[in-house]
């Protein structure tokens, strides 16, 4: 239970599901891994007249909750999955040995069914895949790591994923039996039309940017994703110009950036510089 006195979302959903199914109400639990903030979320949906209606056991009733998920800027799920009552063992795919809940036979992708504006993503790998054909994982940066949110296929270095919600920043990886992810693309932004912008930093072209910090709060740390080292590299701050700004003069051009507090950077998103401003995933 959080300090606010409200239980965790998955526990609330499980409680509501058991209570409502006990009296014959058809209820399911749906889930997403956030792309515009950290961690994950679960909510319920009730079946009526052949259609599922989203609701939250703690917050909002049917239909209002789906509208909230689709319009509030820091929500907007990129993928939505439904927990099934019966396992779907008909799902078959070549297994690479990498373990993820996305492979569960009790999970169904319902992103398109839920009414979100989806697109099919097709992108070429920047690094040679380990084989001519393999599973690949679409990942979002979430609480200090890239977390898989969807499974796709790679064929001759072309990666494909179905029913993705755009206006999000992703990276694509292969999985291994050793439970490691190997990134085969640079991070990229895909907009709502499917246009792709890859973040490949130009270390020979540096830009200057003044970044804000909340008044009275600790200074932030700025990092950029190094596509060769495959981790976020810190960028030195030239000066703290006031109690609300920090000046950086050595930011690689076209870099994916992470601007976060040094301790427990929960909810502080990746982003990029555009038109002289730092845009983060909650801004679009």
Predicted features and spans:
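Hydrophobic/aromatic-rich core segments of domains that either
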Residues: 4-5, 10-99
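Short Pro-Gly-centered beta-turn/loop motif in secreted/extracellular proteins
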Residues: 49, 157-179, 244-265
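Beta-strand-rich domain onsets/edges
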Residues: 92-119
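A short, amphipathic beta-strand motif
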Residues: 117-129, 207-215
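Short amphipathic beta-strand segments in non-cytosolic proteins
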Residues: 134-152, 222-234
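Structured interaction patches on ligand/partner-binding surfaces of diverse proteins
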Residues: 176-202, 264-283
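Compositionally biased low-complexity segments at domain edges in trafficked proteins
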Residues: 197-231, 281-284
């Amino acid at each position: 239970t959080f300090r606010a006195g409200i239980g965790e979302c998955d526990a609330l959903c499980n409680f509501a599901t058991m209570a409502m199914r006990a009296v014959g109400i058809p209820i399911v639990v749906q889930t997403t891994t956030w792309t515009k903030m950290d961690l994950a979320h679960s909510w319920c949906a009730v079946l009526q007249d052949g259609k599922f209606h989203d609701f939250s056991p703690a917050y909002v009733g049917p239909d209002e909750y789906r509208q909230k998920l689709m319009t509030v800027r820091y929500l907007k799920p990129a993928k939505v999955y439904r927990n099934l009552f019966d396992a779907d063992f008909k799902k078959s795919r070549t297994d690479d040995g990498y373990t993820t809940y996305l492979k569960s036979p009790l999970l169904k992708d319902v992103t398109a069914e839920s009414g979100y504006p989806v697109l099919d993503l097709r992108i070429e790998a920047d690094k040679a895949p380990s084989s001519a054909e393999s599973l690949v994982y679409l990942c979002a940066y979430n609480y200090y790591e890239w977390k898989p949110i969807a499974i796709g296929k790679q064929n001759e270095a072309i990666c494909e994923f179905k029913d993705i919600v755009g206006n999000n920043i992703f990276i694509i990886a292969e999985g291994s039996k050793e439970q490691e992810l190997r990134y085969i693309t640079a991070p990229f932004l895909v907009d709502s039309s499917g246009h792709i912008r890859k973040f490949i930093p130009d270390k020979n072209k540096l830009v200057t940017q003044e970044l804000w910090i909340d008044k009275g709060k600790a200074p932030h740390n700025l990092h950029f994703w190094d596509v060769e080292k495959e981790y976020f590299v810190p960028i030195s701050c030239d000066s703290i110009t006031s109690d609300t700004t920090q000046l950086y003069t050595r930011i690689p051009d076209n870099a994916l950036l992470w601007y976060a507090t040094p301790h427990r950077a929960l909810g502080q998103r990746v982003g990029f510089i555009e038109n002289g401003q730092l845009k983060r995933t909650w801004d679009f």
